């Protein structure tokens, strides 16, 4: 077994020709092997991989395989070794019949590249059949008048084997009357004849028994026998004869049933019954022939009985005989050879040998994606087949020997066309031509060549504040024209930050469907808008991605009630405001100031009086500004204390509200005698006699207290030397500082606006270690003004004395928020006659050393004048009115700042970085003295 090579050429071209022929055989796929029939399954036929020159390491990648299931019926091909082996026992006789050559075509397909190799396996005959006769016994009638040398044809033995394994010769049992003669027919088969060697004598022996043996040429030889009984008849010495022993006739396939093939004509010179002939098929006529043809015994006409198919058999052989009616009857024989003519009655067939399905859309142009075989069972021009492909497809057909290749002719795009319906048309060259269609569906597999794309470049979402976490904001959607994993999208939040925190801590996106949820509860007052970057990524390899922007707008909700800035919410602990009974209608009493942290309509504030007020008809409140004014003139029977309750309501839905309570004390002072803020700031106060008396008294007492002041001064100096500048509670005179000191100072003026100006404090905080604190006190009941030079402030201990802008210092030397500011000292009021000046009328023991430096005094008055004149200006934007010195809050209802400084009643000088403090300690809360001008000095308790 093994591949057969072509004849070798001589000379120096021998090697070159052999290599060329081998290469041609591999390219065209021609290999030939042989195997003996009836070989056991697993018998090696040949190694295809070795004969093709394939390496063992390439077998797995080349995927060596049989081309069709029909080949796999008889043979198997090992993918690991490339060995072609017998799959089941092969019976040559049932496969090829009496044909001398039995070839089985086998198709082998390899991949990478895709190739088709044609292999022919010759099935070698095995002497596995013995010769056999049609019948085990035959009776022959021979007339006694038969002459010596007469020949009588015997039945030939049939042996399905071929070649040397078929019938080789015959032998006859020994007999004195008969001998055996063997002739060779045209097809090479031996034909036995019984020869009469001597005259028969019926009276001597009426019956002769002969044994005919047929022996084949196999090794070992096989044989078969039949018993011949010769009956000697009376004379009928002429046998029928045909005009020719072999007759040849042709008939087209598909001839209609009943078609006359030919009419036999035999002659017998005898007369009577010995010359009357009957026709019949000979014993060697096969059953298949008997089914296709019929013989009329009387006329000898042969007609078609069944379908004649050229593809089934191209040749038929009919054995006919003519028998007379003599006694004994004699017969003659002839052979009719029938040639079947081809008709184009078979459409061509397209057989799919291999198909790469699906095909990657990235497959290069010219790649083989399928192999096809075509065949037509007709012959000649009727069997010539051409294969065409449907137009307008990115594929083409390339013919090769015995097969066609399907190649790509254009680039493929799955997103444009996911599959192709390919129709292959096979046509033969017959007339008329026959066609056969083969339709295949070729799928195009996806490659990740498309990035996902969001449906919108910008998404906008709105959410009300205070919504619980998990609230749905919106849904982002992206699409990917790819399929499978290449189109499976995953959404995520790209790592940007919002207010210094990761964006993922604010929102969460469902990675599968793109729904975006809130991660937390949003507060409009803290955050109005988020800018989020949402990304999407497919699951291809490598993955592709895209981004989009999401703007989340937080909508305001009316969740903040108005906050009252003035008057203070803790009105029960606040000092009441003074209102003279002589105030005319429309006089400004106070101004209620409130803010709302919400926005828009939710922050629009309106003011109204509540019935809880003591005298609701006495006062009016402006709906939009919050100004409280007298509605009528004050009467004598009006209560001395009035409580005005103002309702502050926002414009939200539902509306929220707060209340402000203003305490008023009605006084009998003449408004003409009430001091105005501009009076004591612009005109220097006139010294009354009472003030002069006080100065003289203080000068007298000062000598007695000199020792005490000296001791206190030494103690203060010692405290400054120890670095505790803020711990001493003494006041001393300070030399005039340099001009640079005031350039570096940050003055802070605090004015109380609860009806009348009661006290002012100025704090200078230079960058050096010393600070100065001045305070002036005015009382409506006194004719003088008290000015106290409190103490120097040291900044060496910031934890004790350095005050931040948002805090004030209490008497207990602790810091507190401005919202906790203590009420002003009610004793610090001034009378009509009292005016501030460059020197006070208070006792030096109570107020400390008064600044006598002209520069210090002028600077202090300038700062007081600048602040007080703005507060007293009736046309100021802050508002103004009698009795209030025109002071009002800086923020009205129209402002919606989120963090409004809770300055309460304080007014600040721009540029100051500190809050005015009462460094001297707790204010004196006692009521002022009577009209005799005597009042309790605040400086006394400050020096305890």
From Swiss-Prot:
Domain Cadherin: 30-133, 134-242, 243-350, 351-454, 455-564, 571-677
InterPro entries, alphabetized: Cadherin-like_dom, Cadherin-like_sf, Cadherin_C, Cadherin_CBD, Cadherin_CS, Cadherin_N, Protocadherin/Cadherin-CA
Cited Gene3D superfamilies: Cadherins
Sugar-modified residues: 265, 443, 547
Entry's Gene Ontology molecular function annotations: calcium ion binding
Transmembrane segments: 694-714
Name the UniProt record assigns to this protein: Protocadherin gamma-C5
Organism lineage: Eukaryota, Metazoa, Chordata, Craniata, Vertebrata
């Amino acid at each position: 077994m093994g591949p057969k090579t072509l004849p070798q050429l001589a000379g120096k071209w021998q090697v070159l020709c052999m290599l060329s022929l081998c290469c041609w055989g591999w390219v065209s796929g021609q290999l030939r092997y042989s195997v003996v029939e009836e070989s056991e399954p697993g018998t090696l036929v040949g190694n295809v991989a070795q004969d093709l020159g394939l390496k063992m390491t390439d077998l797995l990648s080349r995927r060596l395989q049989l081309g069709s299931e029909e080949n796999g019926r008889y043979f198997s091909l090992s993918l690991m070794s490339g060995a072609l082996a017998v799959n089941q026992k092969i019976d040559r006789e049932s496969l090829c019949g009496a044909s001398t050559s039995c070839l089985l075509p086998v198709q082998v397909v390899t991949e990478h590249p895709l190739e088709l190799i044609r292999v022919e396996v010759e099935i070698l005959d095995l002497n596995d059949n013995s010769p056999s006769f049609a019948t085990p016994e035959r009776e022959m009638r021979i007339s006694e008048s038969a002459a010596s040398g007469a020949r009588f044809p015997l039945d030939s033995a049939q042996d399905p084997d071929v070649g040397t394994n078929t019938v080789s010769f015959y032998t006859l049992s020994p007999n004195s009357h008969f001998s055996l003669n063997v002739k060779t027919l045209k097809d090479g088969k031996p034909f036995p004849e019984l020869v009469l060697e001597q005259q028969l004598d019926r009276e001597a022996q009426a019956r002769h028994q002969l044994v005919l043996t047929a022996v084949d040429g196999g090794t070992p030889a096989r044989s078969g026998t039949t018993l011949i009984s010769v009956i000697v008849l009376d004379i009928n010495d002429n046998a029928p004869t045909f005009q020719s022993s072999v007759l040849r006739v042709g008939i087209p396939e598909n001839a209609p049933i009943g078609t006359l093939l030919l009419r036999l004509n035999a002659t017998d010179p005898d007369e009577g019954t010995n010359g009357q002939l009957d026709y019949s098929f000979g014993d060697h006529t096969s059953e298949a022939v008997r089914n296709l043809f019929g013989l009329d015994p009387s006329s000898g006409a042969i007609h078609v009985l069944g379908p004649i198919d050229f593809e089934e058999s191209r040749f038929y052989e009919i054995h006919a005989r003519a028998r007379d009616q003599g006694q004994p009857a004699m017969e003659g024989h002839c052979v009719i050879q029938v040639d079947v003519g081809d008709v184009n009655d078979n459409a061509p067939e397209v057989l799919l040998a291999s198909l790469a399905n699906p095909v990657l859309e990235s497959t290069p142009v010219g790649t083989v994606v399928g192999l096809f075989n075509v065949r037509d069972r007709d012959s000649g021009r009727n069997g010539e087949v051409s294969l065409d492909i449907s137009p307008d497809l990115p594929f083409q057909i390339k013919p090769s020997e015995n097969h066609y290749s399907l190649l790509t002719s254009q680039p493929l795009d799955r997103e444009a066309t996911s599959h192709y319906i390919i129709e292959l048309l096979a046509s033969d060259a017959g007339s008329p031509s026959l066609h056969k269609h083969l339709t295949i569906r070729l799928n195009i597999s996806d490659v990740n060549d498309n990035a996902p794309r969001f449906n919108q470049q910008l998404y906008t979402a709105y959410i009300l504040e205070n919504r619980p976490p998990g609230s749905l904001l919106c849904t982002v959607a992206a699409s990917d024209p790819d399929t499978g994993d290449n189109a499976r999208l995953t959404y995520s939040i790209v790592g940007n930050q919002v207010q210094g925190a990761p964006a993922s801590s604010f929102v969460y996106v469902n990675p599968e469907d793109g729904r975006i949820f809130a991660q937390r509860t949003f507060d409009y007052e803290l955050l109005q808008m988020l800018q989020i970057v949402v990304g999407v990524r497919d699951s291809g390899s490598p993955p592709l991605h895209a981004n989009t922007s999401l703007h989340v707008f937080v909508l305001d909700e009316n969740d903040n009630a108005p906050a009252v800035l003035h008057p203070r919410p803790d009105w029960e602990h606040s000092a009441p405001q003074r209102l003279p009974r002589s105030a005319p209608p429309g006089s400004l009493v106070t101004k209620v100031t409130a803010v709302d942290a919400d926005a828009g309509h939710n922050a629009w504030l309106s003011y109204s009086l509540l019935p809880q007020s003591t005298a609701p008809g006495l006062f009016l409140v402006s709906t939009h500004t919050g100004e409280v004014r007298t509605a009528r003139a004050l009467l004598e029977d009006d209560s001395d204390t009035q409580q005005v309750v103002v309702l502050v309501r926002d414009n939200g839905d539902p509306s929220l509200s707060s209340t402000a309570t203003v305490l008023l004390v009605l006084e009998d002072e003449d408004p003409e005698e009430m001091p105005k803020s501009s009076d004591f700031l612009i005109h220097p106060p006139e010294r009354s006699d009472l003030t002069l008396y006080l100065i003289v008294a203080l000068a007298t007492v000062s000598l007695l207290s000199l020792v005490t002041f000296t001791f206190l001064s030494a103690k203060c100096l010692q405290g400054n030397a120890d670095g505790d500048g803020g711990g001493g509670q003494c006041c001393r005179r300070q030399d005039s500082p340099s001009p640079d000191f005031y350039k570096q100072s940050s003055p802070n003026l605090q004015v109380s606006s609860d009806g009348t100006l009661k006290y002012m404090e100025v704090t200078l905080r230079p960058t050096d270690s010393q600070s100065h604190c001045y305070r002036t006190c005015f009382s409506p009941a006194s004719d003088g003004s008290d000015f106290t030079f409190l103490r120097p402030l040291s900044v060496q201990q910031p934890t004790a004395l350095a005050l931040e802008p948002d805090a004030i210092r209490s008497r207990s030397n602790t810091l507190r928020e401005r919202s906790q500011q203590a009420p002003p000292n009610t004793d610090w009021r001034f009378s009509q006659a009292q005016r501030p000046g460059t020197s006070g009328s208070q006792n030096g023991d109570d107020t400390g050393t008064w600044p006598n430096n002209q520069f210090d005094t002028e600077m202090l008055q300038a700062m007081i004048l600048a602040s007080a004149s703005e507060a007293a200006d009736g046309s100021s934007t802050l508002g103004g009115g009698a009795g209030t010195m025109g002071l009002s809050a800086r923020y009205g209802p129209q402002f919606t700042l989120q963090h409004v400084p809770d300055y309460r009643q304080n007014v600040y000088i721009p540029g100051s970085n500190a809050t005015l403090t009462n460094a001297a300690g707790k204010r004196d809360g006692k009521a002022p003295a009577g009209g005799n001008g005597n009042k309790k000095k605040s400086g006394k308790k400050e020096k305890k």
